[in-house]
């Protein structure tokens, strides 16, 4: 009887140990999930592009001892490595397209340097001819409308072209605003209803969109939407990604797009300066136009990136809060001897 009692206690103790070990094994899995083959994340198995790049980040102490110049060069090298990793992770046909586009851009840059006077003169003549045609308004609005759908590109080019044709005018702003607002709303509705699964994939496309989604889940008012529309996110992809966030209404999204339409005057201004640069013959006027374009782009980029870093900071705060809540909700373990 004594032996059976000791055996029973041993089995009970073994069961408690198994339950205890199983609890912490589940806890470790929540913090560091396993890959498909049962190995830890440290092997880089099953990681996305963003996760795998962040695994190899340098320690803080290594960067802390660097001079400002060394930090700059370090960040440049790290970004180049990220681009190389992303390029080699693409399929062969995608790599070929990127290489061909790079060659085309290089050829266009060389032609622009050699024949810049003739090209600028042709731009002025063409823009004046397009302004005289009544159909130009409709064509521009249709093109701007369609580039609002992911994965279309060319919104900035079309917006600047509108400024090149109409300058900083109410006429140009109405054309650009109508195409932008209607295209964004239509893209949002399509991805919210018909292509919702695709919209959810766009949310997880990179960490910026995930940060955007986390902010909108906390507060999806049209003011927050308007601020996020000013962040440096791709125009068409943002329309689709916002549609993948639960709780955002078409009404709030529409109001946010209308509120941000004054930003479109920046594109009109840049386009008007490009045309003035082409029309001017004096070196002083061209330098002034070029400096105006650069300053405007710097202000726009600085404002957009400040908003983005504010968004990223808020995203990290939400992550820390959720992690703290999860830790507080863990069951308390009592150890009795």
From Swiss-Prot:
Free-text note regarding domains: The VTT domain was previously called the SNARE-assoc domain. As there is no evidence that this domain associates with SNARE proteins, it was renamed as VMP1, TMEM41, and TVP38 (VTT) domain.
Which GO terms of the cellular component aspect does the record hold? Answer: cytoplasm; Golgi membrane
Name the chain's protein: Golgi apparatus membrane protein TVP38
Role played? Golgi membrane protein involved in vesicular trafficking and spindle migration.
Q: How does it assemble?
A: Interacts with YIP5.
Q: What are the BP-aspect GO terms?
A: mitotic spindle elongation; vesicle-mediated transport
Which regions face the Lumenal side of the membrane?
1-95, 159-169, 273-286
Q: Which residues lie on this side of the membrane: Cytoplasmic?
A: 117-137, 191-251, 308-337
Q: Where is this region: VTT domain?
A: 163-274
Q: Which Pfam families match?
A: VTT_dom (PF09335)
Record key words, sorted = Golgi apparatus, Membrane, Transmembrane, Transmembrane helix
């Amino acid at each position: 009887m004594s032996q059976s009692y000791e055996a029973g206690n041993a089995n009970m103790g073994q069961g408690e140990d198994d339950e205890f070990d199983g609890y912490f094994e589940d806890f470790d899995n929540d913090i560091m999930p396993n890959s498909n083959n049962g190995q830890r994340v440290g092997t880089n198995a099953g990681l996305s592009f963003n996760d795998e790049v962040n695994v190899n980040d340098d320690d803080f102490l290594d960067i802390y001892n660097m001079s400002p110049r060394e930090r700059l060069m370090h960040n440049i090298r790290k970004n180049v490595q990220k681009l190389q990793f992303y390029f080699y992770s693409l399929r062969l046909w995608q790599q070929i397209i990127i290489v061909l586009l790079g060659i085309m851009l290089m050829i266009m840059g060389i032609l622009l340097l050699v024949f810049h006077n003739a090209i600028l003169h042709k731009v002025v003549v063409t823009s004046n001819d397009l302004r005289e045609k009544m159909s130009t308004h409709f064509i521009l609005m249709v093109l701007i409308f369609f580039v609002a759908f992911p994965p279309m590109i060319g919104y900035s080019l079309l917006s600047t072209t509108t400024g090149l044709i109409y300058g900083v005018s109410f006429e140009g702003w109405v054309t650009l605003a109508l195409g932008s607002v209607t295209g964004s709303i239509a893209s949002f509705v399509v991805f919210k209803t018909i292509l919702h699964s695709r919209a959810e994939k766009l949310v997880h496309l990179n960490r910026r969109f995930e940060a955007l989604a986390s902010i909108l889940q906390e507060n999806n008012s049209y003011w927050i939407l308007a601020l996020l529309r000013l962040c440096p996110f791709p125009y068409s992809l943002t329309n689709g990604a916002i549609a993948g966030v639960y709780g955002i209404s078409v009404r709030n999204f529409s109001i946010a797009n209308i509120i941000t339409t004054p930003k479109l005057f920046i594109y009109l201004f840049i386009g008007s300066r490009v045309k003035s640069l082409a029309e001017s013959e004096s070196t002083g006027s061209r330098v002034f136009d070029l400096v105006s374009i650069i300053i405007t782009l710097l202000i726009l980029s600085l404002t957009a990136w400040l908003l983005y870093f504010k968004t990223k900071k808020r995203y990290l705060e939400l992550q820390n809060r959720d992690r703290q809540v999860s830790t507080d909700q863990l069951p308390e373990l009592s150890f009795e001897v």
